[in-house]
Amino acid sequence: MKSLLITIGVLAVYLSPAQTGNKGDFHNWAPTPPMGWNSWDCFGPTVTEAEVKANADYMASRLRSSGWNYVVVDIRWYVGNDKAHGYNEKDPEYSIDSFGRYLPAVNRFPSAAGGRGFKPLADYLHKKGLKFGIHIMRGVPVIAVKRNLPVKGTKLTANDIYSPADQCRWLHDMYTIVPDKAGAQEYYNSIFELYAAWGLDFVKVDDLSSPIYFTGEVEMIRKAIERTGRPIVLSTSPGETPIDHATHVQQHANMWRTVGDFWDSWRQLKEHFKVFERWNKWRANGAYPDGDMLPLGKIGIRAERGDPRMTNFTRDEQYTLMTLWSIFRSPLMFGGNFPDNDAFTDSLITNKNMLYVLNKSINNRPLFRNEKQAAWIAEDPANGDKFLAVFNIEDREEMIESKAAWKSAVINRQNSSEMIDLKLNGSRKLYLAVSSVENIDWDHADWIDPVLHKGNDTISLTTLKWTKATSGWGKPRVNRSVSGGELIVEGKKYTSGLGVSANSVIEYELPEGIDRFTAMGGLDKAGADQNVGATVRFLVFTEQPSGPEPPASATIDIDLKELGLQSCKVQDLWSGKQLGVFADKFSVKINKHGAGLYRLTAVKK
C-alpha cells in the first residue's frame, strides 16, 4: 500500500472554514430535487479531471438553463491507481494529508497539485454557474489509523476514534468512527472544514445508510456540515435505507437512497414502483427519497461493473424512468457521459413540462398499481390542475417454476452453492435459469463447470453457442462473472462457467443423445461480498420456461370521477400536444414498458 502525504498549511484557504452566510434550516438548500451529473455509471472509481470538466462544459452550455447544475466526482478520487471492474485493494496509492484526510490524486486531478485540493476544480465549475460535489466513504481512513495520524485541532489521533467493527464489506478503505469517543466529532469537523474551503456544494456519503443505518455518524456529519457555515447538500448512500429510520434521515439529510445500485435493467426499474410507494409519505421540501442515478446515455466506459454501452433501456423504458422519477419527485443524477448524448437523450432530460412536474407538483401519490398497469397523480399548486402519470408495466412470466426439471434451494450467503446432476433423457432443449428470491440487489450467480454427458463422453457447455441469453443486469458471460471478473464461488476460483445476474435464462440447442447435465450453481463473490441482496434460485428447464409475450401496447382507462373531475382538457406533457376534452373517462394507449404524462384541466359544463 502506497500513499502520498501532503502537509497542511500550503494554502491559507485551508486554515478556516468557508463562511458563506449560511442561515436557517439546511432543507432550504435543496428547495427542489437536486439535478446533476455523477461520474459513477460511466467512469466508476477512475474518473479524471478532464472527464469531469468535459461533462461540466456540456452541462453549462446545454443543460444548465433547464436546472441541471451539480457535478459530482464519485468514489475513490484519492486513489491514483484504481481500476475498472472492481477496486484496486491490492496496492492502492492513497493521497492523504498529515491530519488523515484524503486529497485528490494529482495524476488524475492535476489542478490539485501543490496541496490545492479540489478548490481549482470547484472554482472552474462555479465560474460556469455550476455546483461541485464529491463522494466520500463513512469513517476514518485505515491508513490514518495505521500511521496514527493526528486529528486536527486535538491532541488525539485516528487510533483514538476508530473501531474495526462494521467495516464496509465491499471496500476496505475506512474504519468506523465511534461517535462517543473524544475526537470523533472533531475528525468529521476537520474533513468538512477542508471540503468547505475547497468550495464544496454537495456530498454523497457512502456505506452510511444500508444495511446498517449509522445514526451516530449521520448526526456527526450533519453537525460538521453546519459548523462550516457553507450550504453543502447531504446525500446518504447506499440503499435501501431502513425505513424505520425514515424520520431520522429526513431530519438530517437532503436525499437518501431507496434502492441499491440502479442500472439499465427493466426488472430494476419496475421494482421502483413498489419502492416509491413505500417511501412516498417521507418526501418533504428539501428532503427527498432518492431512486438513484439515471443510467441513461453512454455508461460503463470504465465502470466498476459492465461494458461501454448506450443504455440498455428502450426509449419507452426511458420515458417510464423519467416519468416515474418526476411524478415521485426523486433527485435526478445523470449517470451517462454527457458529451456522448444523442438528441433524444437531451430532449428527454430537458423536457420543460416533465421538469415542471418534478419541481412544482404537490400531493404526489400512487393512484393504482396491478400486474399490468400503474398510475400516479399530483396537483399543480398554481391552478389546481392534475398531473397524471400512467404506465404499462406488463411482462410475460419469465419462469414458470412448475415447468422446471430441477430447481435448487434458496442460494444465499449461508447456503451459497448447490450441485446439479440431472437426467436429460435425450432432450434437445436446455434452459439454465436463475431467479431472484427476496429482491434484485446483487443477485450475481455462476454456473460452474456446466457439462453435458453422452455416455462416457462429455461436452463443456461453455464450448457451445447459446440460442438466446438474458441477464437481469449486464449480459451473460462465458468463463467470467457477469461483472467481468473471475468466477469465484465460496472463495474458490474457477475457469469454466457462465456468469449471470438474476433474472436470467440461457437457452441451448443440444446435440443428439445427451443423457445428463451436471454443474454447480453458486453465488458469485461480487454478490456475496455485499451487505444486501444476493438471494437466488437456480432452475433447469427442458421446455420453454416463460409464459406468452404481452401485447405491444395496452389501453389504460382512468375514471375521471375518482380524480374529482367530470370533464377535463388533457395535454400530453411529453409532446406538448393538446389531446382534447374528455368526459367521465380518459383512455390512452401506451406501449409495453412505456409511460404517459398528462396535465388535466377541469372544464366546467
Locations of the language-model features?
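Carbohydrate-binding surface patches
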Residues: 319, 325-328, 333-335, 370-400, ...
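Gly-Asp-aromatic-enriched flexible segments
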Residues: 400-549, 581, 592
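Structural recognition of the beta-strand scaffold that forms the well-ordered cores
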Residues: 29, 33-39, 69-74, 79, ...
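Catalytic cores of secreted or luminal carbohydrate-active enzymes
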Residues: 320-369, 596-597
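Bacterial Sec-dependent N-terminal signal peptides
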Residues: 1-20
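Aromatic-lined carbohydrate-binding/catalytic grooves of carbohydrate-active enzymes
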Residues: 60-124, 128-207, 211
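Glycan-recognition surfaces
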Residues: 161-166, 179-180, 186, 231-337
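C-terminal beta-strand-rich structural cap/linker in extracellular carbohydrate-active enzymes
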Residues: 582-605
